[in-house]
Amino acid sequence: MSEYTPDLWVIVEIDSPEHGKIRKVLGSWYGGFGGSDEWRMNSGIEKVIDQGDYYDVVGYSGSIYKCYKNRVGWSAYTNRVYNNLKKELEDINMGTMEIVSI
């Protein structure tokens, strides 16, 4: 089981004709000086555990995303990633994607 703590995060909901609706964490990490920003999307949300200052978001794969409540959002980089993924889904008629609340 892997654990991730993104610098910023949002919840996306993907609605596809084949699989229906699924919610996922889209997390991002700042690369720092000389590094590259990174993003990761989990396998799908199985359950959310409110831990006070943060949520433990458990994915279908068993991974846990530790999502701090004061870090909801995204960088310009992650915004581009989201828009590209959303456009690709729509261009090939595989579904839609939108930002939703936890």
PLM regions with names:
Residues M1-D56, Y60-I102:
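Cysteine-centric segments in proteins
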